[in-house]
């Protein structure tokens, strides 16, 4: 989705690319993110609701695997979708992305009814999607991977080179710029995938199993990236079976069980909530 063709004219007066607003980098200048907590804003302004669903429903073989799911994601926050296998969280996620068509309900994105829109049109609205499966070009270099996506945008050659270098530096992959993507580690591939996704300047980034198949150090790096993107104002929706890694980074999460949202709240609420433990986390769950 991130490479959907969407030519957008640029001028020297345009707003800078979203990644220019990402504070720090993976070269060590990012602020510490240990013991991350949701901070209450002292500003009276209410964050813009970028995504919300209304009564999403999906029926397979006469059974409602998703039955009336309402969620919302505001600009500048990280939201998780949690639940056991078969609960409906992945189907909900795919209905939002556009991979699965709902039998009922709505997907509203940035004031637009996206329910019937194909993925490429959702991408043009600003909905970015990073699939669990590897989506990079394995036989292109890191630099070529990013430049290939930039070809779909209205950059000059000089702008492409400058922005590509900036992205690689921001995500700590400039040292492997000329390496084939197939030679990268799991963490480097994830960073390249996220860097490519920002070329189209999404408003919402949907991450499908971002912590799957990477080692603990890479998980920490990916969490740092996600927090950096949050501080830049992106909205982020995550679904992942790695519960601790997900809860450690979200501002809040929805627990989906038997096709419905059964619990919703911050990490601290869900971890200490008896019903969340009974349905999904388990009585002995600790962070």
Predicted stretch roles:
Residues 82-84:
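The feature captures the beta-strand-to-loop junction immediately N-terminal to the Walker
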Residues 205-209:
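Catalytic Walker B motif of ABC-type/P-loop ATPase nucleotide-binding domains
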């Amino acid at each position: 989705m991130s490479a959907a063709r969407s030519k957008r004219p640029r001028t020297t007066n345009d707003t800078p690319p979203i990644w220019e607003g990402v504070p720090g980098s993976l070269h060590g200048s990012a602020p510490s993110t240990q013991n991350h907590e949701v901070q209450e804003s002292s500003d009276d302004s209410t964050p813009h609701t970028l995504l919300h669903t209304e009564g999403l429903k999906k029926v397979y073989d006469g059974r409602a695997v998703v039955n009336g799911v309402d969620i919302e994601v505001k600009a500048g926050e990280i939201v998780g979708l949690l639940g056991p296998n078969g609960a409906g969280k992945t189907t909900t996620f795919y209905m939002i992305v556009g991979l699965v068509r709902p039998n009922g309900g709505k997907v509203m994105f940035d004031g637009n009814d996206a329910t019937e829109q194909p993925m490429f049109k959702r991408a043009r609205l600003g909905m970015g999607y990073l699939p669990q499966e590897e989506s990079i070009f394995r036989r292109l270099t890191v630099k070529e991977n990013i430049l290939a996506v930039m070809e779909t945008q209205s950059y000059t050659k000089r702008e492409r080179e400058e922005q590509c270098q900036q992205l690689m530096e921001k995500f700590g992959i400039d040292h492997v710029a000329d390496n084939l993507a197939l030679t990268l580690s799991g963490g480097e591939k994830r960073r390249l995938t996220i860097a490519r996704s920002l070329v189209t300047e999404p408003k919402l980034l949907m991450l499908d199993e971002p912590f799957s198949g990477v080692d603990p150090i890479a998980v920490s790096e990916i969490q740092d990236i996600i927090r950096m993107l949050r501080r830049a104002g992106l909205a982020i929706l995550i679904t992942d079976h790695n519960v601790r890694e997900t809860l450690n980074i979200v501002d809040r999460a929805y627990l989906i069980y038997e096709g419905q949202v059964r619990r919703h709240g911050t990490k601290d609420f869900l971890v200490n909530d008896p019903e969340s433990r009974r349905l999904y986390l388990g009585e002995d769950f600790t962070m």
